[in-house]
From Swiss-Prot:
NCBIfam families: nop2p (TIGR00446), PRK11933.1 (NF008898). It comes from Escherichia coli (strain SMS-3-5 / SECEC). Belongs to the class I-like SAM-binding methyltransferase superfamily. RsmB/NOP family. The gene is rsmF. It comes from the Bacteria. It is found in: Cytoplasm. PANTHER family: 28S RRNA (CYTOSINE(4447)-C(5))-METHYLTRANSFERASE-RELATED (PTHR22807:SF30), NOP2 YEAST -RELATED NOL1/NOP2/FMU SUN DOMAIN-CONTAINING (PTHR22807). This is Ribosomal RNA small subunit methyltransferase F. One of its GO terms (molecular function) is RNA binding.
């Protein structure tokens, strides 16, 4: 791989020399930072098994190298990246994989280590969604996830990725993460705080990442991180697991934040060592049991991960002063819910007891049961999945429900050719050589649901959402 020139402030280099263990070479650190980052992907096991994904992509000539800490993660090398971006492949468009940096798969691996099986999880700083979607896959779409994002512009991206990956057990919120300790005390079995940070570990992806770096800004960021971890710790139930992570390398934003929490609540914080998380984890292990990943250790981004347990309750915070407002949804009565479920099954949409039907005017929604305890405590940006809109002739089923709930083996499923699937993703109607019999058609490609269509004569009317329509070269190579 070609070198690229990274900007390093002198004070940063001094700080890294002091922070780096004697077992590591500073020259190796500098050399690793100058190398471009290896691409990596994570197979979305909600949609496809790793074995089936490897079989499906075998003809493409991709070189996939397993990532030690994530069974479904792979470093990827491919010859046609310039000709066809990874995000324009059919497998990405249908949610079979997520483009995710290898080291950012570590926090979720830590969250579920040692057989941990939380039922209600919070991702405090969730956008663009790599870790939320990874958590959902580990939970197999069961239980409930509260995915929060402070940046309003990033909430939309977060929802798009959750929808593409077929996730149904997520509620989205848009808050400063510092509110949750007071708003939802002791409500979560597990919390991931991938904290905003100075980004010192991302120079391989962004050579100018340190242009605005200063020791003073590190201290300001660390102060915010302490407030965030304190809030998250209050929201965690006794016995629950908190994973704290950053993509930065200084101790101030990493070890010091976790040690501050332990000093603040000495009887309630237990550090859970990560030395056995995966073979070779001990190479990045700190004396506290955290993973401090310098980029040369595993040839990835710089990263930090700590795992801790809340061993006992701590004093609650004063209740927040903001008003949540009225919740505009009401549960659907059992008899009507049965009729809706039957109609949905007719087009291949099915769900289990983890989801419950709610209604707002003519809209039908499915909410994860595990999130209901939070209703009235926080205001949701989006909750669960929109199933349908009712109208005089029945139901207008929604695209995100199809992606999350449809079975490709449904009697109304119709498999497209590669050329037809590409037309579908471009938002165009499809004219198959042999038209399906049913009027409501579950459109599939590679045996994956990609939408619903109305058959009008020999034409399949496209219902792919306008905001998802793709231009440019797609997977058949045609522009």
């Amino acid at each position: 791989m070609a070198q690229h020139t990274v900007y390093f402030p002198d004070a940063f280099l001094t700080q890294m020399r002091e922070a780096m263990p004697s077992t590591l070479s500073f020259d190796d650190f500098l050399a690793a930072c100058q190398r471009p980052l290896r691409r990596s992907i994570r197979v979305n096991t909600l949609k496809i098994s790793v074995a089936d994904f490897l079989q499906l992509t075998a003809p493409y000539g991709w070189t996939l190298t397993p990532i030690p800490w994530c069974e479904e993660g792979f470093w990827i090398e491919r010859d046609d990246e310039d000709a066809l971006p990874l995000g324009s492949t059919a497998e990405h468009l249908s949610g079979l994989f997520y483009i995710q940096e290898a080291s950012s798969m570590l926090p979720v691996a830590a969250l579920f280590a040692d057989g941990n099986a939380p039922q209600r999880v919070m991702d405090v700083a969730a956008a663009p969604g790599s870790k939320t979607t990874q958590i959902a896959a580990r939970m197999n779409n069961e239980g409930a996830i509260l995915a929060n994002e402070f940046s309003a512009s990033r909430v939309k991206v977060l929802h798009a990725n959750i929808s593409r990956c077929g996730i149904s057990n997520v509620a989205l919120t848009h808050f400063d993460g510092r509110v949750f300790g007071a708003a939802v005390p002791e409500m979560f079995d597990a919390i991931l705080l991938d904290a905003p940070c100075s980004g010192e570990g991302v120079v391989r992806k962004d050579p100018d990442a340190l242009k605005n770096w200063s020791p003073e800004s590190n201290q300001e960021i660390a102060a915010t991180q302490r407030e965030l971890i304190d809030s998250a710790f209050h929201a965690l139930r006794p016995g629950g697991t908190l994973v704290y992570s950053t993509c930065t390398l200084n101790r101030e934003e990493n070890e010091a934040v976790c040690l501050w929490l332990k000093e603040t609540y000495p009887d309630a914080v237990e550090f859970l060592p990560l030395g056995d998380l995966f073979p070779g984890a001990n190479k990045a292990l700190t004396e506290e049991g955290f993973l401090h990943v310098f980029p040369q250790i595993y040839d990835c981004e710089g990263f930090f991960v700590a795992r801790l347990r809340k061993t006992q309750a701590i004093p609650v915070l004063p209740a927040p002063k903001y008003k949540v407002g009225n919740f505009p949804f009401s549960p659907v009565k059992d008899r009507e819910a049965g009729q809706i479920r039957q109609a949905a099954a007719g087009v291949g949409l099915n769900w289990d007891g983890n989801l419950r039907l709610w209604q707002r005017d003519k809209e039908l929604w499915l909410f994860p049961v595990g999130i209901e305890a939070l209703i009235g405590k926080v205001r949701f940006s989006r909750l669960g999945i929109k199933l349908a809109e009712t109208h005089n002739k029945g139901y207008r089923w929604q695209h995100e429900a199809v992606i999350a709930l449809a079975s490709p083996d449904n009697v109304n499923a119709f498999e497209l050719t590669p050329q037809e699937a590409e037309e579908w993703y471009r938002g165009r109607d499809v004219y198959p050589q042999a038209a399906p019999v049913a009027d409501d058609v579950l459109v599939t490609f590679q045996h994956q649901p990609i939408g619903l269509a109305k058959r009008i004569g020999s034409r399949l009317k496209n219902s792919y959402p306008r905001e998802l329509v793709r231009d440019g070269k797609l997977f058949t190579g045609n522009a």
